[in-house]
Swiss-Prot record:
Species, as recorded: Nitrosococcus oceani (strain ATCC 19707 / BCRC 17464 / JCM 30415 / NCIMB 11848 / C-107)
GO biological-process terms attached to the record: rRNA catabolic process; rRNA processing; tRNA processing
Pfam family, any one: RNase_PH_C
InterPro entries linked: ExoRNase_PH_dom1, ExoRNase_PH_dom2, ExoRNase_PH_dom2_sf, PNPase/RNase_PH_dom_sf, Ribosomal_Su5_D2-typ_SF, RNase_PH, RNase_PH_bac-type, RNase_PH_CS
Domain of life: Bacteria
CDD domains: RNase_PH_bact
Catalytic activity: tRNA(n+1) + phosphate = tRNA(n) + a ribonucleoside 5'-diphosphate
Family: Belongs to the RNase PH family.
GO MF annotations, alphabetized: 3'-5'-RNA exonuclease activity; tRNA binding; tRNA nucleotidyltransferase activity
Descriptive protein name: Ribonuclease PH
Binding site for phosphate: R86, G124, T125, R126
Keyword entries, A-Z: Nucleotidyltransferase, RNA-binding, rRNA processing, Transferase, tRNA processing, tRNA-binding
Length: 239
């Protein structure tokens, strides 16, 4: 039995609130159960030095957690003078995922930065950040289309992300903190609308997993991501 009482294949309640902040070109509050992340997409007329003269743009991400987004207060990384390894790894993960569904040449010489701020953490913050960032990115691009800055969208696909794992010997979908902290296996999966994998991150914690368990987790991930993709499509269809 999962601590939440959910079935192994059951997602937490998922909600997207678009246009959550006033100034960003795209903004969403994404909620995976009690995990809540604000994703802001900002478009700037600059590109990394290595792209100068190529005509291509860039998609990048920054990720952070509010000090009291967790059970006990964490110190701000800014106060410590540097970002931690986990933070750097997660923001690279988010950026890589989003670049997989964007034509950077069609984007033009701009940088879109996805700022993902975790205001409450209960497991799955990086997967929520990726799933919410896609919605914010679409809104940012639609903003440029509406202003006729660009004539067609550089986004050529859709994506979402979810966690899966093995909890008390059972493959489960969308782990919350209580499950994630004691799971035998924890995995993060990103897939597109065609059912193809963009990234898989998986680690065994004490007990190695077998091929049949891996397949069971990937099947759960595909099912959950299909639900997330449908919810993204539904929320983006609204004004």
């Amino acid at each position: 039995m999962r601590p939440s009482g959910r079935a192994p294949h059951e997602l937490r309640p998922i909600h997207f609130t678009r246009h959550y902040t006033r100034y960003a070109e795209g903004s969403v509050l994404v909620e995976f159960g009690n995990t809540r992340v604000i994703c802001n997409a900002s478009v700037e007329d600059r590109i990394p030095r290595f792209l100068k003269g190529t005509g291509r743009g860039w998609i990048t991400a920054e990720y952070g957690m509010l000090p009291r987004s967790t059970h006990n207060r964490m110190g701000r990384e800014a106060a410590q003078g540097r970002q931690g390894g986990r933070t750097l790894e997660i923001q690279r993960f988010i950026g890589r995922a989003l670049r997989a569904v964007v034509d950077l040449a069609a984007l033009g010489e701009v940088t879109v930065t996805l700022d993902c701020d975790v205001i409450q953490a209960d497991g799955g913050t990086r997967t929520a950040a990726i799933t919410g960032s896609y919605v914010a990115l679409v809104d940012a691009i639609n903003n440029r289309l509406k202003k006729r800055i660009i004539t067609h969208s550089p986004i050529h696909g859709q994506l979402a992300s979810i966690s899966v794992g093995i909890y008390e010997g059972t493959p489960v979908l969308d782990l919350d903190y209580r499950e994630d902290s004691t799971a035998e296996t924890d995995m993060n999966v990103v897939m597109n609308e065609a059912g193809a994998f963009i990234e898989i991150q998986g680690t065994a914690e004490g007990h190695a997993f077998r091929m049949n368990e891996l397949q069971a987790m990937l099947d759960l991930a595909k099912s959950g991501i299909n639900t997330l993709l449908a919810q993204q499509t539904e929320v983006l269809a609204k004004n």
